[in-house]
């Protein structure tokens, strides 16, 4: 019988029940029954993560529901309690005198992850973790509360997208002004929220013995194979190789359109003819995706059919729904769920194929032996998502209007390249923020403008007050909710673009290599997974150089010096 999302029901954990179950793990360890203890430990974590994922998903589906908010707050309060038990058991196993027996039961990578995990928690920061989760939830709810008037309708921030991509320049400018009016109105509250988050995180780092939050954040992200200096070198690679190409792309657009100046509201209009739209509404797109994945072969089609028929998709934008898109999973049943906000633009296709990449990877690696291995660290996970965006290119005729597939492909490539400077801008901003946690809100806004001048030198807000004064970063939820995550998109995109290059030479080989990468799940750290896939590490000097050259040729743009 096919699994249906509507029938999923994960027991609500209590502190008492959790203490009992984790206590059973300790008892088994006391009896030297390591294999049984590890099996129970894994089961408990799968049960808890499934319930927690469902709780977060339901809140995202309706942020206005008091019941959903209450349950999410309850989950946030449980997280430090559960983490304390998990860390204690991990520490006990890592300190076990019979490391040969432990090593026989757990992979070296799992043990390395656990060594990292035990340095990120202590009962002294339990209250701070709960406060961090609460403040992050406040940001989500505030952004979801936006009610914006434009074009005779009331929309949320996601609903602005069709206006922001209009071929009418005045409409795009209006959308930009409406967007930033919301952030200007809520700017002081957003500044206060962020200030509290920065100090909560800085205090946690101090309590755990770190010099600054950055080092703790890297460990929380389970980055066991690279550090801030490696990331700084990658940022310079982007600045050296990608920023000049994006500048030329934007200058060609300005000249083509005959504009005296290119403003921020002109950047979303990637194609002067108007950004290609997908072939129809939500229902049509979902149906056409089935044809596309069936055509790609292998088990992509059958997997997507399971998701579609089982109700594991929530793609339509609606009032009260949290913004953005994500993929979550329920490890007790081995089935992922895709959440998105379709808004009628080409972005719907990008978000959908991106989250489908996450979902497919999680499904392919569902049989790996430990819950720690079901997902890669997020840097590697984003390769799976972004690579699928490019691997679906040959089938875009199914997803966009007739004759617009090639325009879509060019637009997707330009959008991907343009993202890289913004991605490293966000990352550099965060490194500076947490190096100086006592900055005032005004200093943080000045810092953002400094970062924009460094990585986005073309950016001109046309005098719109809030972003011109350095407030653009407040719209980037990752900065509030997931510090230091954003660079993962840029690192992964460097790798995904190599899949694009490979697919242009041999689509079948690229797809085989992609499936193999998905099957590995989180069985190795980022740089090892990259190497196993035959990709060049983003941290290697010149990693982006050849990709940028091929992209420039594809787009018929001469690079500086050519």
PLM feature segments, named:
Residues 194-200, 204-205, 210-211, 249-253, ...:
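Long, well-ordered alpha-helical segments
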Residues 110-112, 214-220, 260-265, 324-335, ...:
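Active-site-adjacent bridging/hinge elements
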